[in-house]
Amino acid sequence: GITLPNRTGLPTTMIRSYWELGDILHFDPDTARRNIELGYYDTRRAMGYLRGCAYAVSTDARSCEDAAAFDWKFTRLQKAVREKYPVTLTADAALLLANMKDAQLAPLEAAAEDAGVDPTVFYTTRTLAEAFLEKCDRERIESFAPLFEGSGNAAQAARAALLPNTFLQALVCRALTGPVLPEVIEE
């Protein structure tokens, strides 16, 4: 990277890609094409035209509403599961380790990255969610379903703790596809 200080006095914005860009000494047209696309999106993000950290996500009103709705569902689901099975806190650690800056999209982006969603595509919150659902291993993450339904056991909770990234994918999948959590109504 650039290690010399900026002595010109001109405003400068350093842009660092979230993604590994590959070996610059070995020229490959596909890698160059990918790096150009990622660089374009990184620049647009730095200028405030895109949101997200790892993925280029639209800042239009609909996409922002979808991100807020996803965040609302995800937060409530995560809280409900954590209260019943405290050992599942490791999903929080997986999210922190992903180091995503956009709090509303962070779980979706981290899960999409783990699932192998293409970062060189422009997404809305909805299309990123669809791409994640298409790429994720549904059979594997559905094994965590009893934890969301309240019928899980200690072994399943321990498995969630041992596989925090997979459990994070399961949380995201459930937030995207599952029912809205019922509110507790006291009479």
Regions found by a protein language model. Name each.
Residues G1-E187:
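Patatin-like phospholipase
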